[in-house]
Amino acid sequence: MSEKIAVLGAGSWGSILASVLDENGHDVRLWSYNPKQVEELNTQHTNTHYIKDFTFSPSLVAYSDLASALTDVDAILFVVPTKAIRSVAGQVATILQDQHLQPQLIHASKGIEQQTYKRLSQVLEEEIPAENRQAVTVLSGPSHAEDVARKDITLVTAASASPEAAKYVQKLFMTSYFRVYTNPDIIGVEIGAALKNIIALGAGALHGLGYGDNAKAALMTRGLAEISRLGTSFGADPMTFIGLSGVGDIIVTATSSNSRNWRAGDELGRGEALDDVINHMGMVIEGLATTKAAYELSRERGVSMPITEAIYQVIYEGKDIRTAISDLMQREGRSEF
């Protein structure tokens, strides 16, 4: 099966997923809004700002013109930052209408839209009419782009309300080192993918403050409980959160310096000012906006999320990190489950 696939977003994850698809023999068009990045990808076959020491195949072609990238596509993979996905989807919708196309839609972005607090599949469904798309599938799981670039073993989930769409995405991506499972719980997979970045911020902060493994394990375990509570309030399957998009994604994101959210938390824990961390990170720190979204959703739905609330207070209200930790530890005793 060789498909025409447009990959929208040429950051670290988008460009490496494009490389996996290209390696599988698909006709891949990698789109970026940055003409200089497109030129580098097409002439030097590198993407040095995002992926160091990696050379892309010459068969992978980058585009700065969105309509050209979408010509006659069978599938579109969105890997743009959360804040840009609605705008890009709106542009895509116009082009699909003009070209009378109805491709498969996939997204591998991890976040919740600000203001609306909607999942990204909901945003895509709102912006792209049903007559110009198939069912939306989410590709997510414990996956650092750097590891996939080295062809380290990686397992992810393709989640969709349509079993056929999930299996289609599974077939697109499967390689000897990149294994894809299917899951019908698109709600749980998206919520797990987004909210684990909050826990990664906290884990990085604990490291920066000098806390040990016990504290980090406690954070990840109780953080996962919070994610599960919020997810199930939306109808997610609790089993999803002990799978690749729950436990798996938390482990890889909250224990590794490859995670930009972990690195941001680490710097905050070491006393860096938030604005300075944002300015020199050089890439989007999705966990910052997701913290606000999750905090607001928890209050709206009456879901207890004390860790998320503490991280929100540190980021948005300027609360001292050590005070926030102390307040968490001094909460009234209760049953674990």
From Swiss-Prot:
Is the keyword Lyase in the record? no
Pathway where it operates? Membrane lipid metabolism; glycerophospholipid metabolism
Reaction catalysed?
sn-glycerol 3-phosphate + NAD(+) = dihydroxyacetone phosphate + NADH + H(+); sn-glycerol 3-phosphate + NADP(+) = dihydroxyacetone phosphate + NADPH + H(+)
Residues binding sn-glycerol 3-phosphate are 110, 141, 143, 196, 249, 259-261
Listed under GO cellular component are: cytosol
Q: Where is the active site?
A: 196 (proton acceptor)
- Kindly state which keywords UniProt assigns to this record, in alphabetical order: Cytoplasm, Lipid biosynthesis, Lipid metabolism, NAD, NADP, Nucleotide-binding, Oxidoreductase, Phospholipid biosynthesis, Phospholipid metabolism
Q: What is its EC number?
A: 1.1.1.94
Biological process (GO), any one: glycerol-3-phosphate catabolic process
UniProt binding sites for NADPH: 12-13, 110, 145, 260, 284, 286
Q: EC class of this enzyme? A: oxidoreductase
Entry keyword annotation includes Iron-sulfur: no
Drop me one GO molecular function for this one. glycerol-3-phosphate dehydrogenase [NAD(P)+] activity
Kindly list the places in or outside the cell where this protein is found, as annotated in its UniProt entry.
Cytoplasm
**In UniProt terms, what function does this protein have?**
Catalyzes the reduction of the glycolytic intermediate dihydroxyacetone phosphate (DHAP) to sn-glycerol 3-phosphate (G3P), the key precursor for phospholipid synthesis.
Protein family per UniProt: Belongs to the NAD-dependent glycerol-3-phosphate dehydrogenase family.
- The entry's protein name is Glycerol-3-phosphate dehydrogenase [NAD(P)+]
Give the organism the record lists.
Answer: Levilactobacillus brevis (strain ATCC 367 / BCRC 12310 / CIP 105137 / JCM 1170 / LMG 11437 / NCIMB 947 / NCTC 947)
